[in-house]
Amino acid sequence: MFLRGRSPSGPTDEVAGGKGRCQPDAVEPDATALRQHLRNIVALEKACVYGLLRLDEAERMPDATAYHAACEAQLVVQARLSRVIEQTAALAPTSTAGLLCYCEILRFLVTTHQEGEASQGLSDIAGTYAESVRDLLPRLCAPPAGARAPGHAALRDAYLITLARDARQMLEAVPEEASYAEDEVRLHGMLADIALTIPGTVAGAVALATLIGACLDRRDAFEAMPGFLPLQLNLIDAVQDLLDAAVAGIDGAPVRMPPS
């Protein structure tokens, strides 16, 4: 099956052109490598979309040679995209700049992903991202001694953390073959409730990342579930905001540019 992504325009061009948040002043080795992966992924995704247009045109031609050539070219591009995604999933970020760049990579892949379709590459990258957030974010965003998160954010995230814990427990209790069982429907409902809140604290972001990682480990094709897109976007937004605040200082204004 050919990859059918959304037309790469708007924010995609901004990311590819280097105007996104994935362009910190400091040069970190992991960020340098991830920025190159991001450029490659964007370019190959565009090539896939344009290749599909060529396929549609070739299919209407009386000569089958053009269609077969377009098919072969599309398969080559998709194979290259799969390899780059596989390489990206194997490259976990180790710095603030690297984690911010991984945010942009995952945001691009999630927003070009056809909801309801499974994607092993997306699943692998989402798993690496969730693990990186869980392990790296507390260290990168460690507050000064005595500093506390705003009260409303801590209270809001306390409820999210409880929901995430309950969802993980339900996930472990539901048999994998019970795809349409009552418990599975309840799990989907809990994920939808969790998606209503963007974490505002490190603890909340880590809880959400841990839940996403558990879902990816426990559920085949979790990225095809209805709740995948909002959960991922919420986590990306939360991580970017927390890292921006850490870079700017506890009392500083966020430095991330709003989406165009």
Residue ranges of model-derived segments:
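Sequence/structural signature of long amphipathic alpha-helices
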Residues: 1-260
